[in-house]
């Protein structure tokens, strides 16, 4: 899992860089195919890529994002591990959470989907209606984004 996190983090994906967001979704799909045995669907929502793995009509949605707030080059080095802490753009928000969810989906065959957008850091401007639409049809939507200081 740590190697997958390193790969996702090193592929910097600031929201405003659409090609980088496409690239990170493609990498997430490669990881999903290897870990889960089947590829994700790469959907387009208002011109932006969205990762969708799992049921087409899920009762439970695990919602994530793979864009980052950091412009490319904000971290030097881009990836760093010191003791038990990993650092880099998107480690905390929210590439690690995405990977935890992806690995947790192993063995789930129906009723759930892992969905990752690429515009969350700018307020989900292009995916907000899509998120509302898919959420309205689900029984539960879980977001595994980390919080500061143990806040919920």
Name what the model sees in each region:
Residues 1-91, 118:
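Acidic/His- and Gly-rich active-site-bordering loop/insert found
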Residues 94-152:
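Acidic/histidine-rich catalytic neighborhood of metal-dependent amide-processing enzymes
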């Amino acid at each position: 899992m740590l190697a997958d996190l390193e790969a996702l983090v090193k592929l910097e994906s600031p929201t405003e860089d659409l090609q980088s967001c496409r690239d990170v979704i493609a990498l997430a799909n490669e990881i999903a195919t290897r870990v889960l045995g089947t590829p994700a669907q790469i959907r387009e929502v208002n011109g932006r890529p969205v990762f969708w793995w799992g049921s087409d009509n899920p009762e439970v949605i695990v919602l994530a994002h793979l864009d980052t707030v950091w412009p490319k080059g904000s971290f030097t080095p881009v990836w760093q591990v010191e003791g038990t802490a990993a650092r880099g753009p998107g480690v905390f928000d929210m590439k690690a959470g995405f990977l935890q969810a992806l690995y947790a989906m192993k063995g789930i065959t129906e009723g759930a989907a892992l969905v990752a957008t690429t515009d969350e850091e700018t307020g989900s401007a292009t995916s907000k209606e899509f998120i509302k639409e898919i959420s309205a049809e689900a029984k539960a939507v879980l977001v595994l984004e980390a919080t500061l200081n143990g806040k919920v």
